[in-house]
Regions:
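Active-site rim helix/loop that mediates acceptor-substrate recognition in acyltransferases
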Residues: 33-55
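Acyl-donor (CoA/ACP) binding surface of acyl/acetyltransferases
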Residues: 1-24, 58-184
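Helix-loop element at the rim of GNAT/NAT acetyltransferase active sites that forms part
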Residues: 20-35
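A general structural signal for well-ordered secondary-structure junctions
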Residues: 27-28, 50, 113-114
Length: 184
């Protein structure tokens, strides 16, 4: 399995395929599980997928073909974030960890200003939480009732990150959750 990333031209040559991908798959654990054409068009117009601070990339595999998309955010910042969306037909096959590791390698290799790579997921997205851990990311925060979902439900959000130095060394620097003396 060889994973590669192809920049998406969301305003021109790739726009139709990009919109079709987002509309043709359901993302039940994302804020917008089934985005409309209007929502996608508005996001494109507002620069959510391109520009100096954002990038949209197709995730391709030499055997399986197109696996999904990743949106990179805060590229000019030292803490780049991502939104990963695998196509429905590729979920549940153990692809999340190798894909996330490949994305991490791409970010740290291509963006020398990035010191940390971050992502968040809903508290009930156990598959993605395991993926984060297997890819060397560390749980950094739990935000209670911070993730709105379709239908008005609100879930907790769990934040994960990997540091450049951990990626380079292949180690994991854990947090000291009991670092506030005198409390407990």
């Amino acid at each position: 399995m060889t994973i590669s990333f192809v920049p998406i031209d969301v305003r021109s040559s790739d726009e139709a395929d990009f919109v079709e991908f987002l509309m043709g798959n359901v993302f039940p654990l994302h804020v917008h599980s089934h985005p409309s054409v209007d929502q996608i068009s508005t996001a494109i117009d507002r620069g959510r997928y391109d520009g100096d601070d954002h990038a949209a990339l197709w995730i391709d595999d030499d055997i399986r073909g197109r696996l999904g998309v990743v949106i990179l955010e805060d590229l000019a910042d030292g803490g780049t974030m991502f939104d990963l969306r695998l196509a429905e037909i590729h979920r549940g096959q153990g692809l999340g960890t190798p894909v996330l590791r490949a994305i991490t390698t791409r970010v740290f290799s291509a963006l020398p200003n990035v010191n940390r790579f971050e992502g968040q997921t809903r508290e009930d997205n156990l598959a993605m939480r395991r993926t984060f851990q297997r890819a060397g990311f560390v749980t950094e925060a739990h935000y209670r009732e911070a993730w709105p979902a379709d239908g008005g439900a609100v879930f907790g959000s769990v934040a994960y990150a990997i540091l450049r130095r951990d990626w380079q060394s292949g180690t994991t620097t854990l947090l000291d959750w009991d670092d506030f003396p005198g409390v407990g």
